Amino acid sequence: MKLKLLLIPLLGSSLLLSACSSATSQVISSLSSAQKYFEANKGELNKKNVINILKDGYNSDPNKTVNALLAGWKYTLMDQKLLERNLDASRFASAFGSTSKKDDITPNISEKSLFLADTFPGISSEIAKVFKVEKQTVSGFSYSWNSPKKFQVNIQIKMDGKIDESSKALIKSFLEGNSSGGKGSNGKNSIDESEYTGEKAKFTGNFIFTYTPPTGGARNFSDKSFDVPTSSINFPANVKIDVTTSHTKLNELLESNEQVKKMKSRQLTGKLFNLLPFFTTLCFNSFSPFTVFAVIFTIV
C-alpha cells in the first residue's frame, strides 16, 4: 500500500518520494480528495503521518498546503459548527488531545482563547465572567495567503450572553469604580436593577479575530512548524481582537472603565496556533455524520 511505503525506512528514496508525492498531491488538492485518501488509509493513519504528509506538501507547494490548512480550519468552524455542537468527548479527544477542552478551540470566547491573562493579570477570570457566554456562532471566516510574511485571516464570532448574579455583581463593581457615588459617566445610577434583569439581561456581542504575520522576533511559518514530537502544526501570528456588544452597561464599561475598556481592541503579538486538530477532523472523520463538499483549497 502507498501508506506503507511512507512508513518503511528501508525502502529506496526514489520509491519513498513517489509514494509521498502521490499522497501529498491527493491530500492538499481539495477537502473531498483529502477525506477520500484518509478514509482509504484509516487503518494505518495517525497524526504523525498527517504531519509528515503535509510537511512534504509544504516543501513542494507551500501556498497550496497552507491554503489546505486554512480551509480545514474554516470548514471545521463554519460548516461542522465546532463551537456550537455538543461534542462527544472521545471524538473530540482524538482530534484535539485527551486533556483538551472546548475552551482550547481557536478562536472562541473564553478566558484562554481570548488571552485575557496577558491583558488582565490577576483579574482575567473576572473579566471573562463579565462577558457571560450562553452561545457562540462563527458568523464569518475569510483568509488570504501569499507568503509567511503576507497573509490575513479574519474570523467573526457572534455570541449570545446573559447577565447572571455573578456577572451583574462584577459589572456593578467596575461601574462604581468609574466615579464616586455609583454614578456612571452619563450621570445615571449605574446600579439600577432594571438594567440587569428580564430581557435587559440578555445581550449579543461580536468578537472579530484578525490574524497577521508575527512580529517581535517571532518565527514565521516554515517547514519547522510541522512538529511531529508535539503532534502540532504551529501557525505563528499576531492576533487583533475587537469587541462590540448590544448591552448599555457593558458598552459603558468598554468606553470608560480603565480596566475593561482594554477589551474593546487588543493586539497580541507572536502567538502560536495549532492547526493540526482542525485538519485531523477530516482524517479521522471525528465529527460524523459529516459530508465534505468539493471545495478547492485556493477558493476562500
Curated annotation (Swiss-Prot):
Lipidation (S-diacylglycerol cysteine): C20
Region forming the signal peptide: 1-19
Membership in a protein family: Belongs to the MG439/MG440 family.
Name of protein: Uncharacterized lipoprotein MG439 homolog 5
Protein localization: Cell membrane
Ranges that cross the membrane: none
Keywords, alphabetical: Cell membrane, Lipoprotein, Membrane, Palmitate, Signal
Superkingdom of the organism of origin: Bacteria
Lipidation (N-palmitoyl cysteine): C20
Principal location: membrane
Membrane topology: Lipid-anchor
InterPro entries: Lipoprotein_3
Organism: Mycoplasma pneumoniae (strain ATCC 29342 / M129 / Subtype 1)
Gene Ontology CC terms: plasma membrane
